[in-house]
Amino acid sequence: MSRAWLSLASRPCAAATYSSSPRLCRPLYYHHHHYLLTSTISKSLTTCTSTRTRGSLLTLAIETSCDDTCVAVLERLPSGAARLHFNRKVTSDHRAFGGVHPLTAVLSHTAHLAPLVQEAFRALPRESNDSNDRTLWVDGVARARPDFVSVTRGPGMSSNLATGLNTAKGMAIAWDVPLLAVNHMQAHALTPRLVSALAKTRKGAEDRRTTEGKRGDEKVIADEPSPTFPFLSLLVSGGHTMLVRSRALTDHAILADAENIAIGDMLDKCARMIVPAEMLHGGPSTTSNPTISTMYGPILEEFAFPSAVGDDNYDYGYTPPATRVDEIKPFESSHGWTLTPPLAEMGRAMAFEFSGINGQVQAILHDRNNAVPLDERRLLARETMRIVFEHLATRILFALDGTGRPAKLRPRRGGRAARGTKSEVAENKGTGQDITTTTTTTMITEIKTENEQKEAEEAREPATVDDDEAEPPIRTVVLAGGVASNRYLRHVVRSLLDARGYANVALECPPPALCTDNAAMVGWAGLEMYAAGWRSALDVVAIRKWGLDPRGKDGGILGIGGWVRG
């Protein structure tokens, strides 16, 4: 067992205990406010400011890719342990728009970034030697000057990114220190390594033997954080849904990606349709949090499972599907509506698709003129989440067992695609026959035939999505991004892994405060890139789209211009 000192919402530090068991995917304890649904400055995961450790690396980090203005101060010790001296955010208020409004977000960044940076200056660790050139004087106190400035360069909203990037450049120039302009999704993927570094006890860190070398006047930190490469990362947020094989710091192979909208966007849309308006807009959320947010996905989870709030041992009553045939069966409710899993007709295609389920929910409510009782709405919320979470989890299984196929496959042996549009969930007025049920029954029959001919299928088509040589086995799956804070998602993924023979595969889930956008993860990505010898030129610009995969069109993290070796 180890303890990381966490501060959630605006409360004092609270201890969060983690288990070394690979079967657990969440903290055994954390504050009942699972989400930072706030439009005010929030503290999260901070330690008390102390004197800087000799030989450590210190960075000030900025994140402004969307609607959260985030600043952090992070220190990495020679042992590999980390101290988070400051980590705060301001979330812009978009309630009037029902979603993120670009201009409102930029104005919020412009108004709040400088005050947050000023607060961060006061949280810098004290400098023991106030006569050297690494000292900053803040309110008459000698503080340690950061070794470099970390900032998100992309992907994200260009104007928002530019606000943070230009501020970071100014500090780097003023302090005469390097700039590290990092990839936002890389930062999410590396977050569990930050969590493991924060969780190291001081005694354990002091006792651990480390190998140190010299690069200029700073020390190279040799301790390898956990999880070690390779591992699978499921990155799920309002703007991204991707399954990634993280092979190395800058090598993240995309195994599956969303064909249309991201899962976070889909959950927000479904929440606006399913959750009663008075719960969605007019009053406090079910966490008793008095603030209201346009991040409706967390509200959907709380609405679906109100008794789960604050109960870490909540029984969801979930039984994972035993076979692929079970996975693609439509859910037929006693109320007369049906939900069909995404891409059921595509076999084991490595892709994600969420617009269809969104259309099905819309059609169900439209056909009832939105006159749906509360209990039925809760059922719809639960089953919608279950279906899309199983859709995510099955792609993890395909990657682990090597049976996933390239994403651009056509439906096999005929069989019309059940995309979940209104026409597919409505009854055929001429025959009274449910089109979705009939189509899915046909697909199940096809898959049974396909299973019987498995050897012939594997001989005709590649069995994996990757043509690389045999790689080390995957021992860890990481859930990261804002949607990864959904505890029902964690439960579904863990349950499916256990049921399909992967109980020995660890599921790493950062605390909710580190799943959503934050500057601590940006600082950690900067620390890892800095230790690997990378720096950013001062002429770099914000990038709206920036891939992770070095085999992608843009060459991945290192494929764009602006990188220099330190």
Predicted regions and their residues:
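N-terminal mitochondrial targeting presequence
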Residues: 1-56
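A contiguous, well-structured pocket-lining segment that forms one wall/lid of small-molecule binding clefts
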Residues: 302-434, 444-477, 486-498, 558, ...
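Conserved phosphate-binding catalytic cores of ATP/NTP-utilizing and phosphoryl-transfer enzymes
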Residues: 182-231
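Short beta-strand scaffold segments in enzyme catalytic cores
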Residues: 68-75, 190, 233-235, 241-245
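Conserved phosphate-binding/catalytic loops in two-lobed NTP-binding clefts
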Residues: 181-182, 475-477, 493-522, 536-540
